[in-house]
């Protein structure tokens, strides 16, 4: 039987991004890719990201998070999921531990992130510094200027999309800036083609963004390993960084996604702050049948 059988989970969302939070602190249990795919496929625990909370690794941190996509792959960052974990560790009766000033320091394989409560249902996450060098994003070609890279969709003389910005927020992003509604593009078709493009050795999140004013952006996202999503916090952060580098906006903006709005600020110290909502939908336990045929 899988060690995940009968374990409790929280079903949450942040700006429409479906999140499942699983607490494995105090155990040596690790989620396998096959188990993550099984959880994602079940109607009761379907997610965009699975946030698994482990005991802290680095002294001074509150927990270590592993982040799984629906295809079982791991991600280094998930802003919406991090806000949900912040809520769980501060408010959930079964998970909460004492925390100073409603603030936590969490660790992922991409580094440290700080999360702080702003209101009862709103949290700010310090997503750290964006990575802008081609080899840090990473890309397979040595672009000296990642504000625009050579990539396009459609005919050479009349491309549908072209010259995206490239940014890493702990995971790679390509952002196409357009002058009409992002909903008018078939991102469900374009996204998977570009996600796996050879220029992205670790695959990439693909976004289409329209800057609608000096402090507002409309965004659609094809998420690496998950597909079309109602919201993606790291994509919102990457988009604000990219738009600011191109002088389309200042250093802060409200980003409108299909699932809701996120407020992003790229501070002078190079850290990116993301503020947004958290909603608890309910809780459940994993049925042993969910993992039938899977070795734990």
UniProtKB/Swiss-Prot annotation:
Reactions this protein catalyses: (2S,6S)-2,6-diaminopimelate = meso-2,6-diaminopimelate
The enzyme's E.C. designation: 5.1.1.7
Signal sequence residues: none
Domain of life: Bacteria
A UniProt-annotated Pfam family: DAP_epimerase
Keywords: Amino-acid biosynthesis, Cytoplasm, Isomerase, Lysine biosynthesis
Ribosomal protein in keyword set: no
Annotated site location: Could be important to modulate the pK values of the two catalytic cysteine residues: 173, 223
Cellular compartments per GO CC: cytosol
GO molecular function: diaminopimelate epimerase activity
InterPro entries: DAP_epimerase_AS (IPR018510), DAP_epimerase_DapF (IPR001653)
Positions bound to substrate: 17, 49, 69, 79-80, 171, 205, 223-224, 233-234
Catalytic residues as annotated in Swiss-Prot or TrEMBL: 78, 232
Major location (coarse): cytoplasm
Similarity section: Belongs to the diaminopimelate epimerase family.
Functional description taken from the UniProt entry: Catalyzes the stereoinversion of LL-2,6-diaminopimelate (L,L-DAP) to meso-diaminopimelate (meso-DAP), a precursor of L-lysine and an essential component of the bacterial peptidoglycan.
Quaternary context: Homodimer.
Protein name per UniProt: Diaminopimelate epimerase
Organism: Methylorubrum extorquens (strain CM4 / NCIMB 13688)
Gene from which this protein is expressed: dapF
């Amino acid at each position: 039987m899988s060690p995940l059988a009968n374990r409790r989970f929280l079903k949450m969302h942040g700006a429409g991004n479906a999140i499942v939070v699983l607490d494995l602190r105090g155990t040596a249990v690790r989620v396998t890719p096959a188990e993550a795919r099984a959880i994602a496929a079940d109607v009761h625990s379907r997610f965009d990201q699975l946030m698994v909370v482990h005991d802290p690794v680095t002294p001074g941190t509150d927990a270590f998070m592993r982040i799984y996509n629906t295809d079982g792959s791991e991600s280094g960052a998930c802003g919406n999921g991090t806000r949900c974990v912040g809520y769980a560790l501060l408010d959930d009766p079964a998970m909460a531990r004492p925390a100073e000033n409603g603030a936590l320091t969490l660790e992922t394989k991409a580094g440290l992130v700080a999360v702080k409560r702003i209101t009862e249902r709103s949290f700010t996450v310090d997503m750290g510094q964006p990575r802008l060098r081609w080899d840090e994003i990473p890309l397979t070609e040595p672009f000296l200027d990642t504000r625009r890279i050579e990539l396009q969709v459609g005919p050479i003389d009349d491309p549908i999309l072209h010259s995206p910005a490239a940014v890493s927020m702990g995971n790679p992003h390509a952002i196409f800036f357009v002058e009409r509604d992002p909903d008018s593009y078939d991102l469900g078709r374009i996204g998977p083609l570009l996600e796996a493009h050879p220029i992205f050795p670790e695959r990439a999140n693909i976004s289409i963004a329209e800057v609608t004013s000096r402090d507002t952006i409309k965004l659609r996202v094809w998420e690496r390993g998950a597909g079309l999503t109602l919201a993606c916090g790291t994509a919102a952060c990457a988009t604000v960084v990219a738009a600011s580098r191109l002088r389309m906006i200042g250093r802060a903006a409200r980003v409108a996604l299909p699932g809701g709005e996120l407020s992003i600020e790229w501070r002078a110290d190079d850290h990116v702050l993301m503020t947004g909502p958290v909603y608890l939908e309910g809780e459940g336990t994993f049925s042993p049948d969910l993992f039938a045929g899977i070795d734990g």
